[in-house]
Amino acid sequence: MMQVSQGTIGSPWHQAYHSSSSTSDLSGYNHEFLRRSPDQYSSRGSMESLDQASAAYHHHLPPAKSTNCIDQLVHLHNKRDSAYSSFSTNASIPEYRSSPFSKERSYSMESMHSRNSSGQEGIKHADIKYIKTVYDVQRGISEEYEVNSSSVKNRNYSRQPAYNRHSIGPHGRLEQSRFFSESGGFERAAPMPPTRSDSYALTRHHERPNSWSSLDQNRNFRTPKAAGLHSTNTSSNAAQQPKHVHGDGHLHPVLERSPESSPLIKPKQVYSETPQPGQPMLPTGIYPVPAPEPHFAHAPQPPKNNNGRLYPALAKEGSYGAKSSEKVLPFSEPNKNEKDTQNLRSKSVGQYPMNHSVKEREKKQEGPTGFAHYKLHFTAGPDISTSSLTNDRNDQQPLRLDNIDINEQQKNGTKVAEEFSVYAHPAFQNEWSDSKTKQDIASSDIIGLHRNSLSSDAHGEHEYHNHFNIASSSHNKMDERSNRQADHRKKLESLSFTVHADEADGPSSNPLKPDESPSPSQKKSYDFTRRRLSSSSSQSSKTDGNKLSSVFDKVCKIEQREHENHRSQFLCGNINQSGLSTRGQNNKGSFTMVEEIRNKFISQDQTPNPNEWRRLSSSHSNEKVTGMHQLTRQGIVYGLQTGDAQKQMPEKQAEKMHSYNQEQNILQAVPDDDNRSFNSQTMPNKEDDWQCAAQDTLGFNRAYRNSVKDAQCKVLEATSYRRKDLEISPPHYKKPEKNVRPASAPFRKKSSSLSPHAPKERHSVTPTDNCASIQESQGVFFPSRIGAKRRITAEQKKRSYSEPEKMNEVGASESESAPLTVSKMEPVASFSENSVADRRRIFEREGKACSTINLSKPQLKQLQQNALADYIERKTGRRPSSQETRLLKERSQSTYFSGSIMDNQSMTSTSSMNSLNEHNLSYRHREPLSKTGRVSSTLPPGLTGFFDLSSFENNPEYPENRSRSSSFAHQLRSERLLDHRSKVEFGKGRETNKPKEVSLQSDDDVIITSSRRHGKSASAEDLLDRLPQPPALHVRSRSSPASDMKSREYMSRQEVGNKTSYASASNKEIRSIKSNHFEQMSFTPSFKNHIDTGEDPVPENSSTIQRSAQLENQRNTKTQSISGIYSPHPETKQEPLALPIHSVPAKVTQTSLAHATFDYITAEEYLYSGKRGKESASPTDNKEISDQEWCLPENSSSEDLNDPERFAKYTSAQRPQSFETKSGNSINETVQQNKSSGPTAGPKFSTSWKSNGMWSSGSSEAETTFNHGKISLHISESCLQPQSPMTGQEDEGDDEVFVKEQDTESFSGTFVPPSPPPFPPPSLEDALLKQRIEKFPLVPNTLDEIWENTEEASTQVKVKSNERYLQCASEYTASTESSGSYLLNSGITKRDTDGPLLRLSSIVPAPEPLASPVDPTKPIEEQETQPHGADTSILQSSEGNFNPSDSQSTLPHVRSELMSSEDAKSQELAKEIVTKDKSLANILDPDSRMKTTMDLMEGLFTKSSSALKEKNQKRKAKKQIDNIIAPESEXKEEKRETLDNASNYSAYYSTSAPKAELLRKMKTIHSQIGGKEEQFDVNEKKAELISSLTCKLEVLKDAKESLIDDIKLNNSLGEEVETQIETLCKPNEFDKYKMFIGDLDKVVNLLLSLSGRLARVENALSSLGEDASAEERKTWNEKKKQLCGQHEDARELKENLDRREKLVMDFLGNYLTGEEFAHYQHFVKMKSALLIEQRELDDKIKLGQEQLRCLTESLPSDYLISMKVSLPEERRSSLGNKSLPPPLTSSL
């Protein structure tokens, strides 16, 4: 802002004000005396100081935009060299050591003056031509003014009259600076560019306004060097100083001390330090500088008695300067009025008239040129004691004369004395000490006086003079000042200095006793200095110098008051420190908006009498009179009202907060009641004078600031500095704060807001300064930031780098800013966590001990991610996987990091005032979040919203608020899937607690998403987007992967997990079942989902249906939750499905749901469903309940479901057709339910996971388990989405933090999972099973539960004796097809449970036990043997699982009933035979672990890790179930374990390879059998087993026939679908469809063939004995390797097919209606499922045949002949007993 001619600046600039010295080169200055170095002021009064303490500045002069703007922008110590640096330093901020509000206001106005006056060693100005850049707060621009070194000389405290320095009062700093630069006529040259030393001095002066102790100032004012040189000038200066005090007072808030702003006349204060070369103003005083080159007002390091004194080293010191200060001093007093002060600023800055009026006018004219608006950091006025001020006041004319003389003397070196005497004026000194730095009170006073004089000139210099003389009486001064304050206030509103005039007036009016602690005034000076900073102080200094005559009178008064105040301050310097903080508290009590404070200050400036103010300050009440001094940033008005100070006790507190913020900016001498009190007490006139100077300076500064504002506005615009943040401080900041620098705490936010580009350290500086002000006011702490440079910790620096956007907040001391912010801004809680430190604390509160500050950006992200994970873990009880967290983190980082509300709120992290404002705005929005889940801004917006879903949902824009950079709302939309899933699932977890609220919210978002995804609206793109994993479609390929993809919302995700295989889907399903089971268990309605979707749900056993339905519901619910389909309302639990339904083709949804239910009954699922079954009173009740519940969402209707016949038409064609026959009621219920939920989620969900399950042949078992019906139906159903959705969910679950557990919670409590697809129409086998059930009454629910558990296990292998054989055959086929034996068992049993599930396809007499399906692992022989025994028991256990009565009863019970003696006997026979005839062990051993085609097929579909996990879990669960179901038969349990993946174990493969060897072994064993009886018994057992196996084979054959019928029906359905598609779709799309269907057959057959071959090879290898030759083993291994490679290729083909299925489903969804789409899905899924089932049945039949052959061969020929007769009877009995179990096909 201020450019310093390098040639002229020379070393003094760099030495004294080197940018580094500003911050660090304070060593050159006694830190005690460095009240505020221009650097500090540059940071405070300068752009930076304005940025930091914009409140201190006029709002026009944003603190960040003052001299320190460069510092903020550049963050360089050499910023002083830049325009900003010169501005800040030249802003009349002498570099003087600022003690943190210490008692010694080393740079109090007095001390400054005394230093200057005493030494002229004070600030020595090198012949440097300084271009003073003054930032006009009001104008918001910085203007560059060349400060004449002569002015600086004038401002030299020893050489120059204080008035010159004072003419550059803090208030006039800006305008004075302009005037100084403008008033080139003034002897002052442009002050040297302030170095960071200046800022440091300023900062420290801000921090240590006490250095400007009133005593020091009084002493300085009273005993300026000018006193010796020219007592008149001294008195004049004293008088001027008071006026300058006013002008400076105004400047003091902006106390940017430079020779211009600092008093031209050194006070008598002796500066310990001589200005270093580079430091225009040495701490010891103003050092002479060539007139053309103003020097920075370096506050000499005076004794602590020179506390508040600022020395304008750079202030143009010339005779005119001195004269000006003389004039300005009088005007400064009149300029106590804001207008006058402003005028004085503009005028006095510009004018250092030889005559008071002339000088005033000259100052007005010179202001910018003549005066560098630098307030002396130390006032020359300390020497000019109150008496001198009084004398000055009394001698306004003499003062003017003195000023003239002083100007001459300044030329002669005596001007400094005058000026200093003016500054020596206690009031002026107090003003400076009030002005935080109280740059030479002479400077500030003179500046203020000049400003006042300028104001008086503008408003009547003579009036000021007269009034100043009149102002000898503080009342007159107060009156005039009040008037002028009104003007000054107006100006202050425009100007950055509002309070100073009042302060100056205050002290003038209230000459406080010198004993009164200077700390209030010092604090004020400190605040003011902060606020005034460089530009203001320089401006005020010149202004004061200009308006010396009127200021003289005022200075006299001010001197008296100031002298008294100075004494009181001197005595109370420490008190002032504490008092300063007190005053800050009092003044800042109402510190709300800088504007308000400024306005209040203006009013106070206008209204309060200096005496009143002084009384307050003299009383040094904590209610500092500066209640008025609340500085509004725009106006940065220092309210000097006494009444305001009193009434602002609360305001003072807020004002303190604000003051600290403003102190940084303003050096709030006036706002700080403590400073004021201190000044007014010790130097009563000092504050008044300072205020007068501030007023004068304000007047001058107004013009100057206008120019500066123009420049600064440009700078601000360039820096994107926002001044609105200056106005941000809410009025509620009234709560009394410790002298927390108002500017800092509010400016934390404000600063950040003020200057987005301002470094954090700037903002931090302000907070730091606030802290410093507080601390300094307490006299204890030094600012974390010295000068413009902020002391930032390594952590803060790290954070600044980690969050470069918040570099402006880098320096912010989290402790300072946060505490200050919190304490001050508690009303605005937004600052509680504005800073990164706050966020870090948040994370720590989240259990993140590590500090974000210390973290690198990646570490911070990790920390946030961890916090998110912790939060999720807390909320959901499950810690999300790293991937999930990663997704969340990525999602959240985009939102959270860029724009999290917390970040926005974080002051340190806030990049700009806008950020802060947004924080504030968003804070209100964020508050709910903070309250609800302030967990961590690291949490992704969605999660954050989840933390407070209601808040988030209620505030859809909240995420945006939360993260302005990336609104979560948009991100939520873009990441709708992830967020929704997280949200939904999280909501689910929460939903248990508040289901509807979260659900609705989630559902709204989710449903929208899901409906869009779920329905046709959910395009393939959605699926692709949502489901980047096409493999999820593996299941689709099984039955209707397209449907799965159709319900891509759920299924695609889930299918991704399930894509590889149905088994994977089953596994996922199991996994999901686990979670879902709990969910569904929590709400039995899950079963309804099954019914809802259940095309054929009712007839099945209610428990079975319930199981499957619940499992399906769980899956569906997961799916729904994922897609947001789940209804927020428990009643509408399935409604979420309904919601997507409209998006999804209704038929698809219905069909999918209908099939989905059966698809997902795995062991775990079954167990969970069993648990849910337990919940239900009875299977029937459960079914009814679930039906009802599922029916609840009838709104989601599906044409298919609505038209049961129509649907049954397809289903019957699909073998579920029996669904109609199954039960009209069940169909109707199912239809209704499907209408409600089925259409919604069913088709897609069912299809999706169904296709997954069905498609994965291995998982077809699981599906079979899930599908408690015919394999065909189950295949389609199992292939339906329920499984894939679940799988997807589980896959999603990995992504979603809250999904599974929450799903469980939410489902258990709140959500009813979408109704699973209705069970397929009952088959004949179902009818048989039903009959059997009728024969065997239903057992209690407990049995049902056990039965369900057993069913899961039996799903694997267990089937009742004959039923079991049938089921096993059908299961085998079913599992092969899709659901496998699981589907057979669970499906058949379910249908039985639900009622006679009439499966058209399961026409095979149920009585025929399907030994192979149930006990595929068992050799068929054994199974045949077991038909009555083990097989029967297995069948019974599985059927028991399926049949509520039979299997639902505890297996033992069921076995006793359902398991016919034949079943148990067959098992026993098999065991006995194996034990006696080892040759049959491999074939008959129920525990045989031979691999089957279904096993390998299952592997094909369990590619996804989640599916594998589910599979493993399912196996474990099945094992457990098996243990529960058939604990009695270890072989059976082992068999179940073996059959975990596929109950359809084709021992045929194992038998074929080792067949000959086994036979040989059998023969050998037989030959070795000892005892004919034993042999006879074995033979009998074998015969019995053969009979049983024969029956089973018959059942299997019947099942195969039924399966063939199902295949035909499905093919007919496919033809219909194809016809529809051909008519609806484009040719190329139809071709794709045709190719897909054709390839589906090929791929499925290929997989089956390869799986079968591979299974046989593996079995052969496993059967190889140790004696097997290596060559043989090698041959088998090579075959295995070859087959494995081929099988892998086939899997790839399957994956490709799944992707193609996705595409087909996507475009078909656009053409087909819901019903048609459901038919398509059913067709596709059933196609693959039926193929698998057919292959499975073939394998089982082969196995049974081999078992029979082996058994027959093992029997003696004679025995065989005798046995043939009995076989038919056994067969009949077994059939009669086993007719109940539906054929294996029926399970399909």
Swiss-Prot record:
One GO CC annotation: cytoskeleton
Keyword Transmembrane in annotation: no
Compositional bias of kind Polar residues: 147-161, 230-240, 893-903, 1055-1067, 1100-1124, 1211-1263, 1433-1451
Compositionally biased intervals (Low complexity): 904-915
Major location (coarse): other
Expressed in which tissues: Expressed in epithelial cells of the cement gland.
The ASD1 domain, residue ranges: 708-811
GO molecular function per UniProt: actin binding; actin filament binding
Listed Pro residues bias regions: 1313-1323
Basic and acidic residues bias: start-end ranges: 245-259, 357-366, 476-488, 793-808, 1529-1538
Entry function: Controls cell shape changes in the neuroepithelium during neural tube closure. Induces apical constriction in epithelial cells by promoting the apical accumulation of F-actin and myosin II, and probably by bundling stress fibers. Induces apicobasal cell elongation by redistributing gamma-tubulin and directing the assembly of robust apicobasal microtubule arrays.
Domain comment, as recorded: The ASD1 domain mediates F-actin binding. The ASD2 domain mediates the interaction with ROCK1 and is required for apical constriction induction.
Quaternary structure note: Interacts with F-actin. Interacts with ROCK1.
Record-stated family: Belongs to the shroom family.
Stated name of the protein: Protein Shroom3
Organism annotation: Xenopus laevis
UniProt gene name: shroom3
